[in-house]
Structure formats: C-alpha cells, structure tokens
Design a protein with these regions (language model features):
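Extended, aromatic/histidine-rich regions of cofactor-dependent oxidoreductases associated
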Residues: 162, 169-196
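A short hydrophobic beta-strand segment most commonly corresponding to one strand
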Residues: 104-106, 155-171
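A short glycine-rich, His/Asp/Glu-containing loop-to-beta-strand
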Residues: 60-91, 138
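Short loop/turn motifs at secondary-structure junctions and domain boundaries
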Residues: 75-77, 95-96, 122
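Glycine- and acidic-residue-biased ligand/ion/polar-headgroup-sensing regions
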Residues: 89, 100-115
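Short beta-strand His + acidic residue motifs that chelate non-heme Fe in jelly-roll/DSBH
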Residues: 94-96, 114-115, 141, 147-153
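N-terminal leader/capping segments at the start of a protein or of a new domain
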Residues: 1-54
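Short acidic-glycine-tyrosine-enriched beta hairpin
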Residues: 104, 119-147, 187
Length: 196
C-alpha cells in the first residue's frame, strides 16, 4: 500500500488526538459508519483496543444457545461489519478462513482458545500454533488466516467476543485437519444455526 493510500485510510478514522480516547459500543458503531474507505487490519485492531464496554451496553445483543455459539450483527456497511458472538463452555468454530476478509476480535468476557493452522506441501491442513486469550485481549485475523476459536472454559463461564471484519464476510471456507478438502459456509444464511 502506498503512503498516500495509508494516509487517506487513516484520515477516514478519527482525528489524531481522538485516536486514544476510549470508545463505547455506540461510538465504535458511529466510527465504523463514518468510514469513507476500508479500514486496515491494524486500524480495526486499534479500534477494538479502545473499546470500553459496559455489561448493560452488550446485554440486549447477547443470546446463548446450548448446542452452538451464536452470531448477531451489530453493524454492516459496504466497507466493514461488526458482530457479537456468544459462546457456552466448550463451543468452538469449525476450522475456517474468512475468504479474503481480515479483522480483529476482542474478548469481552471469558477466555478464548485460538488455534492457528497451515497448509502442508500436499495442501492438507495441519496445526501450527495455539494461543490462550483472556478477557480484554484483542487478536487479529489477516489474509490468509486459517484458524479455529472457541470458549476455552471447561466449566460454566460463558464467553462473549466482538468481531470486526473488512470487507464484510460473504463466504467462510471450512477445513478438516489432515485434509485438503475445502467446504463453504455462508454467514448470512438464515438456516445457519449460529445466526441469532
């Protein structure tokens, strides 16, 4: 990306003195809605690091289900989208990528297990690294990024995460460990049980 392109993108966010001010969920939504060009992965990461959530602010968006994690869209434009995901203990995604979208994830409550995968020479999915993420942490998803995330708590602690993606998710590619086969999942499909 050229310096001019980076400067233009940076100007679509907030003025310099404002870039360290904490953001409420409403302020983050307004910031995303005001964008005139796609934010970078680094900018999404920085925005989620500034997020200061009150439990009451998230409560209307929370929906836990016993058999699957849930996703609820909080904001969407042509440039980006923001989702809240709710996880019961032990729930996790399939191994997947975001088919060209990049983003950032903030753990709001609970702890997250993040598994990163790679493709071997035969194109098969193999485990690469594992990370434990605590409440308040932010992690990024770049392109390409094959991973699996989930609620690491074996007990009764639920997990809540905020995800911001650019561009908005259209297709999620799914994988099986040790296989080169690639499946597809459509996040907006009403039949997707994760959509709340």
């Amino acid at each position: 990306m050229s310096t001019n392109a980076m400067q233009t993108t940076a100007r679509t966010l907030t003025a310099e003195p404002e870039q360290t001010r904490p953001l409420t969920l409403a302020a983050l939504t307004q910031t995303l809605a005001a964008l005139t060009s796609a934010p970078t992965q680094r900018e999404l990461d920085a925005l989620l690091r500034r997020l200061e959530l009150e439990t009451e602010e998230l409560r209307p968006h929370l929906n836990f289900k016993p058999h699957t994690y849930t996703r609820r869209r909080l904001f969407r434009s042509d440039l980006c989208e923001m989702l809240v995901l709710c996880w019961m203990p032990g729930q996790r995604t399939a191994i997947h990528d975001h088919d060209g979208s990049y983003g950032a994830i903030r753990i709001c409550e609970g702890s997250m297990a993040e598994e990163i995968f790679a493709l071997n020479e035969a194109g098969e999915v193999v485990a690469a690294e594992t990370h434990a993420r605590a409440a308040g942490e932010v992690t990024g998803t770049d392109v390409p990024d094959i991973h699996r995330i989930g609620n690491a708590d074996p007990g009764e602690q639920t997990m809540v995460t905020i995800h911001v993606y650019a561009p908005p998710l259209r297709v999620i590619n799914t994988y099986q460990l040790g296989s080169a086969e690639v499946g597809e999942c459509w996040p907006d499909d009403p039949a997707n049980p994760a959509n709340s």
